[in-house]
Amino acid sequence: MRSVIPVKTTLTVLTFAVLLLVPQGIPSLKNYMSIEPKSAIAVVTFPAKPAAAEALVDPLASPAGLSQTVNKRLLAKAPRNLSDPAHVLDHFYAALLRGEGVHIIHYGDSPTTADLITADARALFQHEFGDGGMGFVLMARPWAWYNHRGIEMSGSNWKIDVSSTSNSKDGLNGLGAVSFRGAPGAVSRWKVKTAHRSVELAYLVEPQGGTFVVEADGNPIGTGSSTAGAGERPFTPGYASFNIPPRTAEIGLKVTSGSVRFYGADFRKGAGVVYSSLGINGANVTLLSNAFNEAHWTAELRHYKPDLIIVNYGTNESGFPDFVDSTWGREMRKVVARLQRAMPEASILLMSPMDRGAKGVHGEIDTIPTMPRLVATESKIAADTGVAFFDTFEAMGGSGTMGRWYTSEPRLVGSDYIHPMPAGARIVGELLFSALREGFNQFKLEQLNQNIVRQADRTGQEASQQP
């Protein structure tokens, strides 16, 4: 009996099956898995007994029909509260798909300073795509609440300069916007909870710098100098990398002579996701638009090569209505322009602030009036400049969320109705990860759909040429 299924459709379905099943058997292709085989029936099963009104057209009777079906699923899986019409996140998604190494940097204010939100997003990304290491951390704690989950740090005898309240005013404070000037007697220590392969120290190259020694559990593993050497330009970032011996519990640094202006330490394991949390207490958008020296910041960004740059400001500014309405948008546009000049290939994501509550005259906790305006402004900036936008405000529940969070059990926000408790921060971190994970799934399905259509076209042409 002659098959009732057209040749092209048969070839297309077989191609789809190969694309679906091959990654299951070849570990190196695991990141190309879009759905489990047991779920494939939802995509390719023919209707058993369609109703008369629906039986006129078989949606899978041609490659074009199959393509339309897959595209409908893509639309259905579009990430919520994540807007990326220019597909700027495709660079980030492609890096995840390659499964080699992916670097995310996340600029923010107080919650990011404490590694709230970012720690939970980091854990989820590293669980899903591999743990590439702790990433960039500061030399010591500029504030008591500075934190990076998975590492304990301490330091002494440093002169600390923060870009947002800088005394030097030169804007040369490294990737994390904080520098640490030290002479002999200045020390830093980092205790990592899991083994890392290497640590790279960043500092300012100077005409007359200083020297330092790096130790693993008290034993020297290398030395470095911040004095400009042959081919090095003074007042540019410098880097010194050291391999970490197996089973090392603590990395230490000591300045041994002169004076060194350090920026931070970058801990790496290898392939996987690195998620660097770059929070500054009390920071606002002008940190990136004005306080950073642009050439210096560009050099730092190009060295660390982030695949995704998240800019997450607005909470502190939302308390100043005049600034929000007259200046904030202009400053954020400057930030985006700086980033696009520095890293034209990187994915850039503007992440809106969370809700911010205030107690009303009758004791109710309402969203402050400036917050929806600020979020709307940021959304428009993202659309105008061709970067992605994650609407944290709407994702967490929109207006009135902090009031609901404050009265929930357990309480999800502090008594200022601004700073999330760890459980609240976890929710936001999961929302961010979920949106990007859904975007990644959509990206994979789009790649799969394109492969199906291309393969169907090729096999159809071959079949038509057969005698």
Residue ranges and their predicted role:
Residues 294, 355-467:
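Catalytic His-Asp segment of secreted/periplasmic serine-dependent ester chemistry enzymes
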Residues 305-318, 326-341, 349-389:
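Conserved N-terminal glycine/acidic-rich loop preference
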Residues 80-96, 288-302, 330-338, 373-375, ...:
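Alpha-helical scaffolding within the catalytic cores
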Residues 107-110, 277-281, 311-316, 351-355, ...:
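Active-site-proximal beta-strand/loop segments in catalytic clefts of secreted hydrolases
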Residues 115, 119, 123, 295, ...:
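Solvent-exposed, polar/charged alpha-helical surfaces in well-ordered, non-transmembrane soluble domains
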Residues 28-73:
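Juxtamembrane proline-rich low-complexity "stalk" or linker regions positioned immediately after a signal peptide
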Residues 113-330, 419:
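Conserved SGNH/GDSL esterase-like catalytic core that processes O-acyl groups on lipids
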Residues 8-27:
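Hydrophobic membrane-insertion alpha-helices, especially the h-region
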